[in-house]
């Protein structure tokens, strides 16, 4: 049986997964109803009707199907479809509540939130209903921990299924011996940090509303603000608190688990992040004569894919913008809420290049052995790192070409294309409400494939392609 072949049982298994995901997203859609009622807004039905419909529809679909012999490529197909479905459902309340939004605009906004990219088409968010602002923040918060991670707790009747759902969303590491244990630990860490973030920001002088939304967008490294300014607070304490949240986002959940359990850790990704952050922050501060705290905040925001800024990025020099593009492309650590290629893959590529150089200059009799921390660098690991890096660069390049074809400045197009693909959210203003539909769709696709690290989307396309070929031959 070919990897791209889908039998009726395979399709039923995928539909079972999607049914559970649709049910969960439907339930999530009901949550903003509480905010709508509390603030006496007229958006209540805009959340209630789609929320109830998809909760029931997903429940029925899940009950009508059963998971049978699911493989990793099946859950990858389900994962790729899940993020699309989440955005299509999440867009409905936005479309119904924002008068000037087309449905494509709403899908763009929802995809940006779910994937924690943080791009927005809304020119004045401060006039939006509170329930809509909460929905944008809530989608980012859920998207940060992962739709499939949450769904695995509901859907998984076995550790195997849970692990397949977990890995299909571009995750590999285990914190606990079992997949279910790992997922539960991740969720509890995420909730704990969210509560701490809200509490600390509230004690710093923010209202509970601002503290809640800022924490949800900060801890998820989403960065979609409830203010017209990316980060409207000049207070040093608040900048530091959000900065700590963003730094937390660049560290993997396994590192957080070791921190919380008092175990020693010496993670190479964390070392890299701290060194590169300090180095590039100093360069930008000196080159563009901006305060070091603002430079540091912007660099951390770019690396963690949060997207908050305290300065106008468009005013930075070409060197600084290039360094930010580099940070956005590489992203944070594996097993984090951040986007990008991931630090560990970049380090693997550097080690592989070092190996090639050593092989040339060392004597033929020399035995060369490369490793990264406790990980031996074999062919499979190196190949995967190069493939993902190439696909990210290719996706960013193709997205930039579309923007350039629409008449946008090449430098701005490349910057925003990398920001889309790496789910960053820092923008030079390429995609706005006035952008042609094709430009918005390009942004949607770039955010989608970037969140899944591209491979599951390619598996989906390959599956659909070969399925279509077989149907045409009949």
From Swiss-Prot:
UniProt membrane topology term: Multi-pass membrane protein
Return any one Pfam family short name. Answer: TrkH
Keywords, sorted A to Z: Cell membrane, Ion transport, Membrane, Transmembrane, Transmembrane helix, Transport
Q: Does the keyword Transmembrane apply?
A: yes
Cellular component (GO) terms are: plasma membrane
Give the transmembrane region(s). Answer: 17-39, 44-61, 81-103, 144-166, 186-208, 239-256, 268-286, 319-341, 385-407, 444-466
* Biological processes annotated in GO: potassium ion transmembrane transport
Its main subcellular localisation, reduced to a broad class, is: membrane
Protein family: Belongs to the TrkH potassium transport family.
Q: Where does it localize? A: Cell membrane
- Name the chain's protein: Uncharacterized cation transporter MJ1485
Question: Molecular function terms in GO for this entry?
Answer: potassium ion transmembrane transporter activity
């Amino acid at each position: 049986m070919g990897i791209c072949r889908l039998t009726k049982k395979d399709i039923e298994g995928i539909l079972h997964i999607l049914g559970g995901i649709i049910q969960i997203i439907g339930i999530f859609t009901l949550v903003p109803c509480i905010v709508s009622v509390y603030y006496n807004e007229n958006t209540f039905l805009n959340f209630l009707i789609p929320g109830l419909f998809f909760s029931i529809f997903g429940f029925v679909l899940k009950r009508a199907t059963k998971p049978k012999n699911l493989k990793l490529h099946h859950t990858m197909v389900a994962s790729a479809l899940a993020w699309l479905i989440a955005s299509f459902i999440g867009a409905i309340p936005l479309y119904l509540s924002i008068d000037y939004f087309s449905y494509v605009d709403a899908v763009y906004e929802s995809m940006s939130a779910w994937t924690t990219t943080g791009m927005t088409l809304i020119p004045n968010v401060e006039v939006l209903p509170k329930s809509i602002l909460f929905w944008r923040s809530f989608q980012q918060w859920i998207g940060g921990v992962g739709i499939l991670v949450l769904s695995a707790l509901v859907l998984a009747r076995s550790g195997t299924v849970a692990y397949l759902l977990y890995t299909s969303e571009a995750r590999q590491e285990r914190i606990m011996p079992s997949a279910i244990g790992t997922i539960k630990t991740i969720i509890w860490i995420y909730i704990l940090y969210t509560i701490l973030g809200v509490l600390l920001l509230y004690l710093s002088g923010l209202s509970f509303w601002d503290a809640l939304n800022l924490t949800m967008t900060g801890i998820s490294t989403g960065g979609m603000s409830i203010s017209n300014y990316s980060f409207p607070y000049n207070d040093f304490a608040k900048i530091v608190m959000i900065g700590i949240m963003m730094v937390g986002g660049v560290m993997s959940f396994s590192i957080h688990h070791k921190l919380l359990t008092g175990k020693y850790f010496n993670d190479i990704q964390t070392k890299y992040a701290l060194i590169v952050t300090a180095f590039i922050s100093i360069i930008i501060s000196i080159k563009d004569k901006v305060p070091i705290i603002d430079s540091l905040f912007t660099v951390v925001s770019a690396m963690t894919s949060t997207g908050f800024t305290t300065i106008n990025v468009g005013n930075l020099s070409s060197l600084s913008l290039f360094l930010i593009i580099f940070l956005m492309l590489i992203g944070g650590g594996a097993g984090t809420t951040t986007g990008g290629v991931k630090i560990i893959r970049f380090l693997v590529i550097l080690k592989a290049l070092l190996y090639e150089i050593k092989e040339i200059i060392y004597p033929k009799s020399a035995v060369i052995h490369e490793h990264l921390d406790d990980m031996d660098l074999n062919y499979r690991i190196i190949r995967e790192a190069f493939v993902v890096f190439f696909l990210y660069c290719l996706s960013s390049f193709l997205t930039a070409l579309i923007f350039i074809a629409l008449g946008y400045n090449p430098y701005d197009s490349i910057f925003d294309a990398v920001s889309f693909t790496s789910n960053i959210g820092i923008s030079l203003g390429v995609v706005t409400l006035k952008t042609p539909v094709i430009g918005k769709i390009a942004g949607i696709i770039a955010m989608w494939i970037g969140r899944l690290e591209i491979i599951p989307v390619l598996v989906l396309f390959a599956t659909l392609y070969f399925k279509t070929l077989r149907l045409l031959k009949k």
